[in-house]
Every structure is written in C-alpha cells, then in structure tokens.
C-alpha cells in the first residue's frame, strides 16, 4: 500500500468525492480494471462479482487538488440487475465497460447505458458523466471490436472513450482521471453540485496538522458490510 505522511498542511484531505458506478456484461474485465487502478497490479484470478463490490482511491487532478473516487463494481449477470439499479441513484459518473475481444459485450453497451440513464439520481441526472471503456486492448490477435467502432459509439452518445489493458496497465489510470476531470469540469461550470441526501457528489473534508493518507484503498465486499463513506 502506498502511503504519504502529510504534515503542516491545513488544506482539505480531498476537495470533492465522486461516486462512480462501473457497468457492463459479466467477464468484460470490470473487476480487473478496478483492481489495477486501486492496487497497481493485475489480478491473476478474478472471480465474477456477486452483487456489488466497493473500491476507492484518491487522485490528484492538478497540483494540490485531490478528489476521492468511490467505485462501485457491479455484477453483470441478469439476476443481479435489480441490485445494480439501486446504486445508479447515488452515482455522478458511469463507466460503461466492454471487452474488445467480445463483440456481444459491445453490442450490449447500449442497453447498459440506457438503463443507467433511466435510473440516475441527483439534482441534474442529465449532467452526470458517462464514459465508454474498452478492455483487453493488448489482445490484438483476438480483437472483435475496432477502436473506431468504440470511438463512433462514444461520439454518438456524447461520451468520453478510451481503451485499456489490465494486463499491461495501458491507459488504466488515464481512464479514471479522464472521467474525474470531466466531472470536475461540470462542477466548475455549475452543472453539477452537491446536495443533501445525494451521495454521488460530496464536498471534501479537512485534515488535522499531521495525518497518514493512504492513496490506495483495497476492495471491500459490500455484502460483508462495506461502508459507503
């Protein structure tokens, strides 16, 4: 775990907290993507998510400006869809994931995006940020979805787009910084704002003179009572 000791700094521990939901078919690599982002390494074995798992990490959008990302990893199986829907309401951002080596997973993205759009909450659901992410970009010999197809879909739906690899780490950090920066842009423009009772976007907290700040938080199984803080 990467840890920073911070002293003589009375600024906020983080300026904002963004809650993001990660959606897509089962086995597209959602959990592997999140584990690489939060742990800095590829998961050798990744069992299918049951219900919803929770991850978190602090990132710096610009020098001295930190945001905390809460990341909800949802199960792709149909039997868990009702559970997934309940998490949309408290999300400010949606990462729609497909596997570049599985065309069917790409064809299902439109349904996932529609479902998310219908269930998002907050004061301005239409202003919440969507981003399309293709996984397994290193597996060119098995590719079934061209980069241009993902790019076209994203442009049509007015989404950001990026391809990643949880095997090599290519573009993993960039994917999360990209969506966080777009959320921040909308906050700065007044399109998104924190409101009581909505967990999607929250203002930061202050820290004491000296604290130990963990940059990476490891996943917790929500079924085991993971907190939503």
Curated annotation (Swiss-Prot):
It is found in: Cell membrane; Cytoplasmic vesicle membrane; Golgi apparatus. Disruption phenotype: RNAi-mediated knockdown results in reduced survival in response to oxidative stress induced by sodium arsenite. One of its GO terms (cellular component) is plasma membrane. The modification Cysteine methyl ester is found at residue 229. The keyword Repressor does not apply. A lipid is attached at residues 227, 229 (S-geranylgeranyl cysteine). Belongs to the small GTPase superfamily. Rab family. This is Ras-related protein rab-39. The gene is rab-39.
């Amino acid at each position: 775990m990467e840890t920073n000791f911070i002293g003589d700094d009375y600024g906020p521990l983080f300026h904002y907290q963004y809650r993001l939901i990660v959606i897509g078919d089962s086995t597209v690599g959602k959990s592997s993507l999140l584990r690489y982002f939060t742990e800095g390494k590829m998961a050798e074995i990744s069992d299918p998510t049951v219900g919803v798992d929770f991850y978190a990490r602090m990132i710096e959008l610009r020098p001295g400006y930190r945001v905390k990302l809460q990341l909800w990893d949802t199960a792709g199986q149909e039997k868990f869809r009702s559970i997934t829907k309940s998490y949309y309401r408290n999300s400010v951002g949606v990462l729609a994931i497909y596997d570049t080596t599985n065309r069917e997973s790409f064809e299902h993205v439109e349904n996932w995006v529609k479902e998310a759009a219908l269930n998002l909450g907050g004061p301005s659901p239409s202003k919440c940020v969507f981003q399309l992410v293709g996984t397994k970009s290193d597996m060119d010999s098995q590719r079934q979805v061209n980069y241009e197809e993902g790019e076209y879909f994203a442009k049509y739906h007015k989404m950001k787009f990026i391809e990643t690899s949880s095997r090599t780490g290519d573009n993993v950090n960039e994917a999360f910084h990209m969506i966080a920066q777009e959320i921040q842009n909308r906050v700065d423009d007044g399109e998104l704002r924190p409101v009581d009772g909505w967990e999607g976007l929250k203002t930061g907290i202050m820290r004491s003179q000296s604290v130990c700040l963990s940059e990476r938080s490891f996943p917790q199984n929500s079924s085991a009572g993971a907190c939503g803080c």
